[in-house]
């Protein structure tokens, strides 16, 4: 298998892949399971859903009755992606460690980082320093 060109400026993830002979064989022969040469999961999950079903449908519903539409979610996601790239200077391929409780802002940060081309590394908030250290050192 040959890797297609990447949009990542930071090539850490590609450089850290195991040798090619250890890669799995991926065969996409089913017509319904075809993927484009380049795919951004956040664009597919958020923007394509809006394209298909509209921006005013509920995207996030909370137990307290609060809800965000896809339009509101996308605005927050795009703003977070902009902060990562324009304010913090991150580039596609940089790793972003998320350590948050599950909630709507976790979704915003995860999708925003993906949309900006980052590699998202999520960790559990219950982990202590000794458990986080080896991960943070690699991120």
Q: What do the predicted segments below correspond to?
A:
Residues 46-49, 73, 77, 96, ...:
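Adenylate-forming
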Residues 1-40:
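Flexible, non-catalytic linker and terminal segments flanking ANL/adenylate-forming cores
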Residues 133-139:
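Short, intrinsically disordered, charge-balanced linker/junction segments flanking boundaries
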Residues 59, 72-83:
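Conserved N-terminal alpha-helix of the aminotransferase class I/II PLP-enzyme fold
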Residues 66, 83-130:
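Conserved AMP-binding/adenylate-forming
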Residues 78-82, 101, 137:
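Solvent-exposed alpha-helix faces
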């Amino acid at each position: 298998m040959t890797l297609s060109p990447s949009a990542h400026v930071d090539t850490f993830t590609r450089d850290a892949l195991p040798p090619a002979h250890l890669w799995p064989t991926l065969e996409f022969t089913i017509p319904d399971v075809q993927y484009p040469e380049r795919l951004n999961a956040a664009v597919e999950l958020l923007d394509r859903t809006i394209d298909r079903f509209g921006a005013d449908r509920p995207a996030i519903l909370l137990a307290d009755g609060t809800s965000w539409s896809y339009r509101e979610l996308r605005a927050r996601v795009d703003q977070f992606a902009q902060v990562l790239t324009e304010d913090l200077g991150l580039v596609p391929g940089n790793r972003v460690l998320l350590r948050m409780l599950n909630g709507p802002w976790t979704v915003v940060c995860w999708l925003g980082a993906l949309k900006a081309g980052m590699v998202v590394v999520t960790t559990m908030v219950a982990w202590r320093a000794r458990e986080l250290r080896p991960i943070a050192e690699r991120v």
